[in-house]
Amino acid sequence: MNEIDKTPRQIVAELDKYVIGQDSAKRAIAVALRNRYRRIQLPKDMQEDISPKNLLMIGPTGVGKTEIARRLAKIVNAPFVKVEATKFTEVGYVGRDVESMARDLVEVAYRMEQNDAFKQVRAQAAQQANKRLVKLIVPAKKKQENPNQYLFNALRDLQSGSFPNMNGNDMEEVTEDVRNERLSVAEQLKRGLLENNEVTIQVDDPSTQFNNQSGMLGQMGIDLSSLSSMMPTKKVERTMTVAEAREILIKEESEKLVNSADLADAAIKRAENTGIIFIDEIDKIASKSQQNAGQVSREGVQRDILPIVEGSQISTKYGLVKTDHILFIGSGAFHESKPSDLIAELQGRFPIRVELEDLSVDDFVKILTEPNNALVKQYIAMIGTDNIDVTFTIEAIHRIAEVAYQLNHDTENIGARRLHTILEKLLEDLLFEGPDMQMGDIKITEAYVNDKIGSIVEDKDLSQYIL
């Protein structure tokens, strides 16, 4: 595992490609990330004493709080989970256990390590997968096995702690004709001539697998997936193309080539040293002076979160994970409460406060046009699939930005999400009628914008419901 060594300036430059404005938040989060890299470079005895400087991002919805954290995790290839503080309950109440956020992080880290390991062994796994495909396409007769020998093998498997092979021995009688045909098929597979041919393979039945993330047991942190590995796997036959079957077989062969224990150790280290946990709506659990006696204590949730943020050991199915050096980012609008309403101990664990600014008209214009895959580019591409060439004039984009700013100011401030609502209403007719009409080139002008949504914007009561 290699920690990303981008400088804060490089990190901010990457974030600028996707998030408009909010320079102070980008700088703070870039410095926090760089400090983790700096800690890794220090002697071991000093590393343990340096804890991450957790951030508290304050600002209304839709200004980029979550997007900054999510994009950051992708830039540095770090395990990232987003949780909502309101989904957790204190110990003794029904609901998600706060420790599940750390378990989710380790699960993400394990998948990342697994994907990295699979990439390294893919070439070898592909060779084995192609050999299995050849045998599936050109099957050979099975050897008749002595019943006594089959019983002996079953008892031997049980004694070794594994389940007996109910399908009997896989030994084949390979004749000269079969061998020659397999050589021919192997050559055709190598040249990619059989990719669209159909083949039947056996895969694990998904209905027999435990889903650890659903139901009350998953919320309580009880891991059922470990039980599934102790149960015999039920196989079902599926018919698919050779290309699809190869990917499934490559995955199966990769699992054989990779040591799961090594992956678990690497996942724990990756989560501990580079993991990011984003706690959204943390303002909703801030204690208030008036609270009903029957209401689940918000302060209780804070006190349950506190030891995880401070640093503790949490049991996961991959082993114990220490949260001492995981970066926590709290986020909230703090409309009805203040950061000082959080318990003092939790406030102290989020020493860096960053206030995100409301979006201006210029910000909305940039959001519409500048980022990679900006909103306007997305809609142009989607409508283009119906052979309609849509263009927006500069005046139209400015008008859309002005409408978004005005509506956020006059009604509820939902930030950049307002643009989605406006564009959907603006392009409603094109999106509906486009597949059935040969419209050719369409230019979205300021007059077009005013015609489609101008009357709705002027009627404040109507705009509250539609835009």
Curated annotation (Swiss-Prot):
Compartments where found: Cytoplasm
Keyword Disulfide bond: no
A cellular-component GO term for this protein: HslUV protease complex
Top-level lineage group: Bacteria
CDD domains: RecA-like_HslU
Similarity comment: Belongs to the ClpX chaperone family. HslU subfamily.
Record's protein name: ATP-dependent protease ATPase subunit HslU
Lineage: Bacteria, Bacillati, Bacillota, Bacilli, Lactobacillales
